[in-house]
């Protein structure tokens, strides 16, 4: 299974060519879910008509082990802001969407999700172990294909994973929360 991502320049439009970055992940649940509505119409054969799809949602989560620089664009999208001198301020107004390709190379099955907004973001810093990141997505469209789209593919980051002892202090409003807060 592969996961690749690209920033969109036009919301909901897959970049062309689809130049993308491979992402390392521990779990990914992007999918399409649909809602069906039962028809109330009855025809002369006295049978109720079949249900129809009346809405679709494109959503899910991507979980990963933290790596320096590998998920900066997704964190910035969650903050609706840009990084400035290694500082990310949440609560901005900069809207950023992504196109994500999920691929199953063994069965030639590829799904491109577009118009993806990062709608949730979580950091898990365990007492022992690797730091985990979770990004929730809501999107506008999914297309399927038997072959991967054309475009340059950048390999996943080779930076080391981060643990609770391999990073400095986590600051909230410029103050360390080490030993005093659960976020």
Put a short name on every predicted segment.
Residues 1-183:
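Signature of extracytoplasmic/envelope-associated structural regions
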